[in-house]
Amino acid sequence: MNILGSYDTSGEKHNTKFLGFQHKYRQTVLILSTQQCASYCRFCFRKRLVGISKKEIFTNLEKAVDYIKDHPEVNNVLISGGDPLVLSNRVLKNFLEKFSSLPQLDFIRFGTKVPVYHPERIAQDEELLQILKQYNRKKQIYFVLQIDHPNEISPELIEAAGKLKQCGIILNNQTVLLKGVNDNPEVMAKLQNQITSIGINPYYVFQCRPV
């Protein structure tokens, strides 16, 4: 590891099939869509590239489509980064157009913290909402969020979540267990109850993951 935290703590290199395209779990492929992010978390397990380097970033959508077609066991795509929601609507639409046309895929996921850190990107972008609504009719779209503390549940987040739900998007949350932030039962229970009350499903907790 160097001062930038370049060490690949999750062994992603071993699961990379070609630039920016990973196949670790049998049914899921993952795309590193961008190195940019709406936030720069100290606990990020991709410090080696987020906000720094494009050398691992996905560039070949047609190759991804061909790979999926050649692997019938794949039933979903996770578009990650960085944060894919910092990309333009045109790029997001292109992803959805290509992947929603594949009969073998049951759903498409976006890993994003934008609804938490930049909710206006969603709530005030009617074009994006219409794109999501359009393609959700073809394939179920999930947003996998990262809300780590009740204080992150702002009125703006609630508005953005509501508009996503109106488009038919399913919202799941992955919480990072953080010392001194949410590592006690009261805070964690409050967080899970509050996100459930606004239609966001508690999905899983990141714990003891090397960063």
Regions found by a protein language model. Name each.
Residues M1-L30, R48:
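N-terminal [4Fe-4S]-dependent radical SAM core
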Residues N2-S6, G51, P115-Y117, Q174-T175:
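N-terminal start-of-chain detector that recognizes signal peptides
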Residues E12-T16, Y40, N136, Q166-C167:
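Short, flexible segments with low predicted structural confidence
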Residues K13, Y25, E56-N60, Q124, ...:
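Short secondary-structure boundary/capping elements
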Residues H23-I57, F110:
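Canonical Radical SAM [4Fe-4S] cluster-binding loop centered on the CxxxCxxC motif
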Residues Y25, F43-C44, L61, I79, ...:
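Broad hydrophobic/π-residue packing in well-ordered secondary structure
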Residues I31-L32, F43-C44, N76-L85, F99:
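Conserved catalytic-core segments centered on acid/base and nucleophilic motifs
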Residues E62-D70, N76, L85-V211:
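Conserved AdoMet/S-adenosylmethionine-binding subsite of the radical SAM
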